[in-house]
Amino acid sequence: MSTVTPPRTPRRLGAGLAATAALGALLAAAPQAGAASPAPAARPGDLLTVRLDQLLPTQPSVGKDQIFYKLGRYGSRKDEQAGDFNKRFDDWCETNGQGEAEKVPSGARLADPTSFTCEIPLGNETDESRAAMKIVVIGPGGSLYLTDGHHSLTSFWEAADGGPETPIRLRVQADYSGLSQSAFWDEMRAHHWVWLRDEQGAPITTGELPTRLGLSRFHDDPYRSLVYFTRDIGYTAPEDAAEYLEFLWGGWLRERLDLGAYDLDDPASYLRAVRDASELMVAADPDEVIADGRTAAELGRLDEWNDGKKAEKGEFGKLSQPLTAEKPGKLAFALDYRSRIVAPPRCTTTLRGPRTGPLVVDSGVTCLDNTRQTGPVVVRAGASLVALGSELTGPVQAVGARDVHVCGTTIDGPLSVVGSGLRTEGPGCSANSFGGPVQLVANTRG
């Protein structure tokens, strides 16, 4: 098994900022994007041990409700109350090619795999356990491109005991480290190993892909979430599943089902959406082409809704269980977690991609969405800044700002926020990385 040795991590915001943190800002540092050491040469099928912060996404969006389900369950005691280990340990072991968790002592943490034990020892992996692992392609310069597992690994990233430095093993799909960037992306497109459509189904370029994992780096595709909840109700993933299968079904459903007609904050209404979507999938002709030349049968369409079981049974019955049940359904966990997320203010101006020069926000709400900003950023009194999944090089200053909402963002320069509404952590807000001095004074929680 080949191993990628993680580089030394930049300093964390620690004791020197204790007084600042007490003002309401928890600033969890993560390594700079792109700072990871390149992977060694590898052959298809090799297993690489990596850190989550070394991985480059190959899709711009995720179904966030799927991740909210995982995070809601990871933070719950329901599994332990039922006599099981918390699902996050089973998920990590499975993703690492080691089956399920075998021993999970008190104090075990995802970020430290030596603190718990999986049922399959390292080196004893089976074909079945290897098949459950997530996939990576080695790109130019040894960069690591994740082609499967964005939802699972983002869940580990956002888990309270996980984070960007959590290690995991991935199975190598191909080594294109010797190719140029242009030839590399040609190969990725030819093999359908990259998803170049946004959350509305519109095409994007490779330059618009996120540069690292984390909830705040991805856009939300509600149809991708919907397809996740229809699994084993309207379709089941075949053994030779198409790449990005759930996005293919999601695009098909987007043309046939208006999610705006449902209240996705209400469990009963969301369940109706799942039922309506899954019934459409089952009603499709097996030979109907859904997307990319794939038929409904090839994408796992079930012959009978809910696999022939009554609504109160099978997967739909499980999905319907409320949070108060002994075994809550996935929807209940997802909606409970989502209810705890503080939404950023609505954008009046949105900036994306590379930008050079000073940025002065003097009114309204300016949103930096996966923006690479080079130059000072100033937020005037009464104005708001939202930075999601962005990389800022230069000083950032806000005095009397209405809101400063920073999640999943790297700031390489001094940060000063005074007398403002400030949010840098909490459910749904990915950890930030700060590479300069930080001054946070007399702020309120935004």
Language model feature labels by segment:
Residues 362, 369, 374, 380, ...:
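Feature marks extracellular polysaccharide-active and adherence modules
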Residues 92-94, 117-119, 346-348, 366-368, ...:
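Sequence contexts marking disulfide-bonded cysteines in secreted/extracellular proteins
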Residues 143-145, 366, 385:
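Hydrophobic residues embedded in beta-strands of well-ordered beta-sheets
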Residues 42-117, 122-127, 132-136, 140-143, ...:
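Surface-exposed, charge/polar-rich loops and edge strands
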Residues 346, 352-356, 363-365, 374, ...:
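Tight coil/turn sites that cap or link beta-strands
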Residues 1-36:
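Secretory targeting and sorting signals
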